[in-house]
């Protein structure tokens, strides 16, 4: 399209702009496109795909070839060199998830089959091996072993290699899978496991911290780690000593600077390290540290360090100095120098390079670290913040599994080497298939995923615990939230408040509301809705590009040039300097927006004040999409939005938006160098009133800073902040439909609400959480009213008639499982109906409900301690004539009983074979849970309450329309908690039910306010603030107050009285102390603790105290010798007593004391301490 003059062009552009009114819809179209393409667990899937497609191959290729040679045999004088073998592992292949039955027949494994049969959903891994045989004087012989099986890798559901990845909703339904299930978890032994993202400090980054009080005033540290390498991180510290013991002034000039190198026990003066790298002259060293010699302050700071290292002036002397302080003392000087060289080359700053000839680069980097230290101590650059989220990386499934696989593959290679070496030493050839122990990888991965101990099974105490967790399936929202969880591996008992606090840099990356209460507060976090975690990309294209774009290499420049130029870092490694940083940044940004050379997840930061450009391409950076603003207007135009609206037909998608440079991903560090407008309205403000005119980006919608659980809350911006946190925790316990295929699943526990409703008042974000399709609550008519006093202290009154009609009724499923395992020896297990005549150890329970095959039939009502699975174990035949009385039993009972506190109906029975090929059975029992007094309910604003009483409709208060509320809550619940969102939701719901449309309660939305809602309500003839006149249900008289009433969305939580009720009169006791057991499951007693004891003492209730702590707990009697006070021998049958020590047979008293006290006395006696009881 050609324009005659510029004005037309300008008008055309203006027409393209999105107006403020249209923006309310436009931004949600963009967000829709994002979630359509990405879903909510993309970060898990992408990370796993990266592991399968890249990391596994890289690990296999990086492992060195196995070189084998037999010991030379000196037999007949002449020595012949035995043949040499080498094994190289090459290309890997991953098949589709497969299951091999016991008879060896393979079949594709479907996830639901894996869940039901307790299998592991994993795919076989194959590798090509090249075997080379070198015999002296002959050509090497190469043999290829194609596709050798080396183990199975668990597959993440819905990832590229999963069987479900490309299926349509219909196909999924036919496979008994829920189309709404997001995937992102593994199935290990039939249970669903999710890998929690682990937070860690970023490697290869220089940090400067000031030390409060210690021998150092400042500390610079860098934890170097080669990208994708098995070597553990090696840390280098460059520290500035504190002056004396008196308190350190921060402006203290001239302290010694020392380095702490890996594997070197003592501190090494920094100048000696430089000399060991081959920079001997003072001037050379200083050039690498202080780039500008006209800086007297800095020169002054390094003086003491120069003086300290004055004695060492040659490289070898310096190397010897370092080597002497190394691990092995008492070796020759050459050895020491070699050792020091090795450490400087391999262990110090390995990310700069571990090959030869990296000395210049290392010297520059070390100089840079000292430079940073000096800047910090002079107060010219602020210190680093440990809790800044830019300094953090998240390890997802990919890096975690790669770490595990690397170790296991190493073990596998070790085993192969040992096995083959044995054969070669005997002069035989070996079979590769037998040399490879496939279960090393299979079992290693399965063990870590099953237990959550991340690391080697043999060193379980070193491993991180709780990395893999069982996926929470209580509600759909709790599942989604669990898949997006982030964990900081800081000890939960630490009293440090800093890591737990909400840091500014978390904006838009992690949810500000969703964190647990108690010990883990602030350490367990959740991703915000649009946050994404980078999977990492290769830095090589960027390095090549920089070479072309006039970046000067460190080896080629004069050190004096650095002072004026800008340093360039790629992934923390200093690669060079550049004279025109602004131009370079513009070019880099342009390339990233066109997705040319540079991937969209790469971040680039230009620190203008410190003259640095930092580029990061590594994995685990958390980033989020923002709209790009240029010259004060959005690059997103109406045409883009129109195209997105039609994206089902025209192949337009989120990815196209990113590729066309309208949206870009910004990570936490880069976010600090850009200027973000909250909405396009900010861009359009008058120049005179505007807060800023140089915006570079714009938020898509501020509601996207919230996470999964907080996005369900209506009007969260009108609630006090801890209330949102409480609801985020409670939303995970609400009952609803947790997944659509629950009828074919055999979950251990499941709660399903009878009539879930979608809320009348929703947020726009809910669509992506599928809360409309899988809701967890009911729109109930709620009155806020003091009525009969049965709703004091956060209890609620329910309408009994509504409950009879099915209000908040739910069904509870519990599964029981058992299998016929083969025992050691000739004991075998069988499912059958045990008979009292032949079976030992049968309980007095109902065995007659079982069928003849030993398994209960569906539809039978069962109650506590009924048998659901009958199983017997054959006893070994005993040949002794003595035990003639036990002879009649040939079997022992090993049945499964229903939990003693539950009742229900057998819902479904499944019989199949497990992975070992044994008979395997799962039984699901259902019970109906009707709301009753003591059950817990909550609104979506952290307003939880238990049911205090239920009144029939006739006894409830009612309005003039005859409307009786379902729930009455107490007005005292509102003022101190300031949950205004609760009230606005009620008002909005009242309007919505009259208007016949769903209310919008998205946070940070200017379009909705109380004023508008009130005006509309008035049009429908209601009181503008939602109050009603009500009448007392008992007397029929008008209540002397206006009552706030309307529909509010309430949730039923999983805490029910039936699962909690517990009492005990008599029951089992512990064997050791003979005191009652603990806990409801074991029918235990209630503990009368120390504090209760103290109260009774202060009351002086001595007899009651004796009864509680002695008579109803563990009474016991012993006989005590009156002379020595020790326990005597008593034979009550013959009435003979004697104390062996005193030869006393008459002076003996009976003493009653707690059994625990008797045990303590005897344990003391075993330690040679005699507690003597003085009896009179």
From Swiss-Prot:
Residues engaged in binding Mg(2+): 794
Binding site for Zn(2+): 1121, 1124, 1139, 1142
Signal peptide range in chain numbering: none
Keyword Ligase: no
A single GO BP: transcription by RNA polymerase II
Catalytic activity annotation: RNA(n) + a ribonucleoside 5'-triphosphate = RNA(n+1) + diphosphate
Primary location recorded for the protein, binned into one broad class: nucleus
Subcellular location: Nucleus
Claim: Manganese is one of the keywords in the record: no
Database matches in SUPFAM superfamilies: beta and beta-prime subunits of DNA dependent RNA-polymerase
One Pfam family recorded for the sequence: RNA_pol_Rpb2_7
Zinc finger (C4-type): 1121-1142
Gene3D superfamilies noted in UniProt: 2.40.50.150, 3.90.1070.20, DNA-directed RNA polymerase, subunit 2, domain 6, RNA polymerase alpha subunit dimerisation domain, RNA polymerase Rpb2, domain 2
Record's keyword terms, sorted: DNA-directed RNA polymerase, Magnesium, Metal-binding, Nucleotidyltransferase, Nucleus, Transcription, Transferase, Zinc, Zinc-finger
GO CC field: mitochondrion; RNA polymerase II, core complex
Entries under InterPro entries matching the protein: DNA-dir_RNA_pol_su2, DNA-dir_RNAP_su2_dom, DNA-dir_RNAP_su2_hyb_sf, RNA_pol_bsu_CS, RNA_pol_bsu_protrusion, RNA_pol_Rpb2_2, RNA_pol_Rpb2_2_sf, RNA_pol_Rpb2_3
GO terms assigned for molecular function: DNA binding; DNA-directed RNA polymerase activity; ribonucleoside binding; zinc ion binding
Enzyme Commission code(s) on record: 2.7.7.6
Purpose: DNA-dependent RNA polymerase catalyzes the transcription of DNA into RNA using the four ribonucleoside triphosphates as substrates. Second largest component of RNA polymerase II which synthesizes mRNA precursors and many functional non-coding RNAs. Proposed to contribute to the polymerase catalytic activity and forms the polymerase active center together with the largest subunit. Pol II is the central component of the basal RNA polymerase II transcription machinery. It is composed of mobile elements that move relative to each other.
PANTHER family: DNA-DIRECTED RNA POLYMERASE I SUBUNIT 2 (PTHR20856)
More details: The binding of ribonucleoside triphosphate to the RNA polymerase II transcribing complex probably involves a two-step mechanism. The initial binding seems to occur at the entry (E) site and involves a magnesium ion coordinated by three conserved aspartate residues of the two largest RNA Pol II subunits.
SUBUNIT field: Component of the RNA polymerase II (Pol II) complex consisting of 12 subunits.
Family membership noted in the UniProt record: Belongs to the RNA polymerase beta chain family.
Name assigned to this protein: DNA-directed RNA polymerase II subunit RPB2
Lineage of the organism: Eukaryota, Metazoa, Ecdysozoa, Arthropoda, Hexapoda
């Amino acid at each position: 399209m050609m324009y005659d003059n510029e004005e037309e062009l300008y008008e055309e552009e203006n027409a393209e702009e999105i107006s403020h009114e249209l923006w309310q819809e436009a931004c949600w179209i963009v967000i829709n496109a994002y979630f359509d393409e990405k879903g909510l667990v993309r970060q898990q899937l992408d990370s796993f795909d990266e592991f399968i497609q890249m990391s596994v191959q890289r690990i296999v290729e990086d492992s060195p070839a196995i070189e084998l040679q037999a010991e030379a045999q000196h037999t007949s004088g002449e020595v012949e060199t035995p043949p040499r073998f080498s094994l190289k592992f090459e290309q890997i292949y991953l098949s589709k998830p497969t299951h091999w039955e016991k008879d060896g027949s393979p079949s594709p494994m479907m996830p639901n089959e894996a869940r039901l049969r307790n299998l592991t959903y994993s795919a076989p891994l194959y590798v090509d091996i090249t075997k080379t045989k070198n015999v002296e004087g002959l050509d090497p012989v190469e043999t290829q072993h194609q596709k050798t099986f080396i183990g199975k890798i668990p597959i993440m559901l819905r990832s590229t290699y999963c069987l479900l990845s490309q299926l349509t909703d219909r196909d999924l339904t036919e496979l008994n899978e829920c189309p709404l299930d997001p995937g992102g978890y593994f199935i290990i032994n039939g249970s669903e496991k999710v890998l929690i993202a682990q937070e860690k400090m970023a490697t290869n980054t220089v940090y400067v911290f000031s030390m409060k009080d210690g021998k150092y005033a400042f500390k610079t540290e860098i934890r170097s780690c080669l990208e994708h390498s098995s070597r553990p991180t090696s840390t280098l510290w460059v520290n500035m000593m504190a002056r004396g013991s008196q308190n350190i002034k921060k402006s203290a000039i001239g302290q010694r600077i020392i380095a702490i190198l890996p594997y070197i026990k003592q501190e090494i003066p920094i100048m000696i390290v430089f000399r060991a790298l081959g920079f001997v002259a003072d001037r050379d060293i200083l050039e690498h540290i202080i780039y500008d010699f006209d800086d007297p302050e800095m020169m002054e700071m390094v003086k003491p360090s120069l003086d300290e290292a004055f004695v060492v002036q040659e490289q070898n002397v310096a190397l010897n100095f370092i080597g002497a302080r190394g691990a092995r003392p008492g070796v020759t000087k050459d050895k020491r120098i070699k050792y020091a060289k090795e450490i400087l080359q391999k262990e110090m700053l390995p990310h700069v390079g571990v090959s030869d000839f990296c000395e210049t680069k290392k010297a520059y980097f070390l100089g840079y670290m000292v430079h940073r230290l000096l800047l910090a101590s002079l107060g010219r650059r602020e210190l680093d913040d440990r809790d800044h989220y830019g300094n953090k990386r998240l390890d997802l499934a990919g890096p975690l599994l790669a770490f595990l696989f690397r170790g296991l593959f190493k073990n596998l290679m070790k085993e192969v080497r040992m096995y083959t070496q044995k054969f070669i030493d005997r002069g035989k050839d070996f079979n590769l298939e037998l040399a490879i122990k496939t279960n090393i990888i299979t079992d290693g991965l399965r063990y870590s995923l099953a237990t959550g101990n991340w690391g080697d099974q043999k060193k379980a105490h070193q491993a991180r615990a709780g990395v893999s967790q069982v996926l929470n399936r209580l509600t759909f929202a709790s599942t989604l939230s669990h898949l997006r969880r982030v964990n900081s591996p800081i000890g939960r008992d630490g009293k440090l408040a800093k890591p737990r606090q909400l840091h500014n840099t978390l904006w838009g990356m992690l949810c500000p509301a969703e964190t647990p209460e108690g010990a883990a507060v602030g350490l367990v976090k959740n991703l915000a809705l649009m946050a994404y975690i980078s999977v990492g990309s290769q830095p090589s294209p960027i390095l090549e590009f920089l070479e072309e774009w006039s970046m000067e290499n460190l080896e080629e420049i004069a050190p004096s040039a650095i002072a004026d130029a800008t340093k360039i870092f790629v992934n923390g490694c200093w690669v060079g300097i550049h004279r025109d940083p602004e131009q370079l940044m513009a070019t880099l940004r342009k390339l990233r927006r066109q997705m040319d050379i540079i991937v969209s997840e790469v971040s680039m930061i230009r620190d203008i004040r410190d003259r640095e450009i930092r580029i990061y391409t590594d994995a685990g950076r958390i980033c989020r999409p923002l709209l790009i603003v240029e010259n004060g207007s959005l690059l997103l135009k109406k045409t883009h939005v129109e195209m997105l609206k039609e994206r089902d037909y025209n192949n337009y998608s989120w990815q196209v938006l990113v590729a066309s440079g309208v949206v870009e991903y910004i990570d936490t560090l880069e976010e600090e160098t850009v200027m973000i407008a909250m909405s396009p309205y900010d861009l359009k403000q008058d120049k005179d009133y505007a807060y800023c005119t140089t915006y570079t980006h714009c938020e898509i919608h501020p509601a996207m800073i919230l996470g999964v659980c907080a996005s369900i809350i209506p009007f969260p911006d009108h609630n006090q902040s801890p209330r949102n946190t409480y609801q985020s925790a409670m939303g995970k316990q609400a009952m609803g439909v947790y997944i659509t295929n629950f009828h074919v699943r055999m979950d251990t526990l499941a709660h399903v609400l009878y009539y879930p409703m979608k809320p009348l008042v929703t947020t726009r974000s809910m669509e992506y959480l599928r809360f409309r399709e899988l809701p967890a609550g009911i729109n109930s008519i709620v009155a806020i009213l003091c009525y009969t006093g049965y709703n004091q202290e956060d209890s609620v009154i329910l309408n009994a008639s509504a409950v009879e009609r099915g209000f908040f009724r739910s069904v509870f499923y519990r599964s029981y499982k058992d299998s016929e395992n083969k025992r050691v020896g000739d004991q075998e297990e069988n499912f059958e109906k045990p008979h009292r005549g032949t079976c030992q150890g049968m309980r007095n329970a109902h065995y007659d409900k079982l069928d003849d095959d030993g398994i209960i039939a569906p539809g039978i009502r069962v109650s506590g301690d009924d048998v659901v699975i009958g199983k017997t174990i054959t006893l070994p035949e005993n040949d002794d004539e003595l035990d003639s009385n036990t002879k009649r039993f040939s079997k022992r009972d090993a049945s499964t009983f229903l939990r003693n506190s539950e009742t229900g109906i057998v819902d479904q029975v499944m019989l199949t074979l497990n992975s070992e090929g044994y008979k395997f059975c799962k039984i699901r029992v259902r019970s109906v849970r009707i709301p009753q007094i003591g059950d817990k309910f909550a609104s979506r604003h952290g307003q939880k309450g238990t049911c205090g009483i239920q009144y029939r409709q006739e006894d409830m208060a009612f309005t003039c329309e005859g409307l009786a509320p379902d729930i009455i809550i107490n007005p005292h619940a509102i003022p101190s908690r300031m949950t205004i969102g609760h009230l606005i939701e009620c008002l909005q719901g009242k309007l919505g039910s009259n208007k016949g449309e769903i209310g919008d309660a998205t946070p940070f939305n200017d379009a909705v306010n109380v004023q508008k809602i009130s005006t509309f309500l008035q049009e429908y003839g209601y009181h503008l603030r939602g109050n009603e006149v009500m009448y007392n249900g008992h007397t029929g008289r008008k209540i002397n107050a206006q009552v706030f009433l309307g529909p509010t969305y309430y949730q039923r939580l999983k805490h029910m009285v039936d699962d909690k009720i517990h009492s005990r009169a008599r029951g089992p006791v512990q064997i050791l102390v003979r005191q009652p057991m603990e806990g409801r499951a074991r029918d235990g007693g209630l503990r009368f603790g120390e504090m209760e004891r103290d109260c009774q003492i202060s009351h002086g209730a001595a007899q009651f105290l004796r009864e509680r702590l002695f008579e109803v707990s563990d009474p016991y009697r012993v006989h005590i010798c009156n002379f020595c006070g020790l326990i005597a021998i008593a034979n009550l049958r013959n009435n003979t007593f004697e104390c062996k020590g005193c030869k006393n047979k008459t002076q003996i008293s009976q003493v009653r004391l707690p059994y625990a006290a008797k045990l303590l006395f005897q344990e003391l006696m075993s330690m040679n301490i005699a507690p003597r009881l003085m009896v009179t």
